[in-house]
Amino acid sequence: MRKLLPLALLGLSAFAQVDVPFWHAMDGPAGRLIAAFAQEFNARQDRYRVLPRYQGTYEEAETKLVAALRAGSGPVLFQAELSFFPRLVAEGQALPLEAYLDLDPGFVADLFAPAWNYGVVGGRRFGLPFNNSTPVLFYYLDVFRAKGLEAPRDWRAFERTALALTSRAAKGFIFVTDPQAWLFEAMVTSRGGSLVQDDRPNFTSREAVAALEMLYR
């Protein structure tokens, strides 16, 4: 079965231009930016030709990848969502990258260490960080000004502000998440906690309980 190399180029034949299919889950402006990056890379050299292919959402792309790997095919590059990535490694579908990487130490030192370590499993690097999702809080500045409020800088101030904005006609805070609950995880980690400790679920930690209690209130 063909092995997958997440987010790094595989050294292939140097005798002819090699097509490098890259399956990703970025549409809209992000997808157009990926296409532009690939076009620029392809124009700078003639050894590889990166071919970006949008595959739908993360879940849709993962389903297509599993089917392709079972059929003995699949892309050379794949944008793996963080929770799916270790599965590829565990099933032997990802290649270790140490032999292919010759990076300037200064380049690595300039990267955000936690993001750079996303691609490391069991002490070995199987992937490179490609994108990172960050929760963003949107608020209506005019409403804040009318109430004499400032943007909160910690969770206690956040809760006080939300209560001050709540009335019979409106809620001061609306929380939206998805089945993966990564936004809730961000609420826990921002308090200094973690949903996993010693390879076991940690949903009863002080930080996780505090996040749940705030949402309940």
Model-derived features: positions:
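Short beta-strand->loop
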Residues: 23-27, 127-132, 140, 147, ...
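Extracytoplasmic "Venus flytrap"/periplasmic binding protein-like
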Residues: 40, 44-111, 146-153
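Sec-dependent N-terminal signal peptides
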Residues: 4-13
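Immediate post-signal peptide segment of exported/extracytoplasmic ligand-binding proteins
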Residues: 15-21, 42-48, 122-123, 145, ...
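Short, well-ordered beta-strand elements
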Residues: 17-27, 48-53, 77, 126
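Solvent-exposed loop/turn segments at secondary-structure junctions
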Residues: 27-30, 57-59, 82-87, 133-136, ...
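Glycine-centered hinge/linker elements that transmit conformational signals in sensory
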Residues: 162-166, 200-217
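Hinge/lid segment of periplasmic solute-binding proteins
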Residues: 82-136, 159, 186, 192
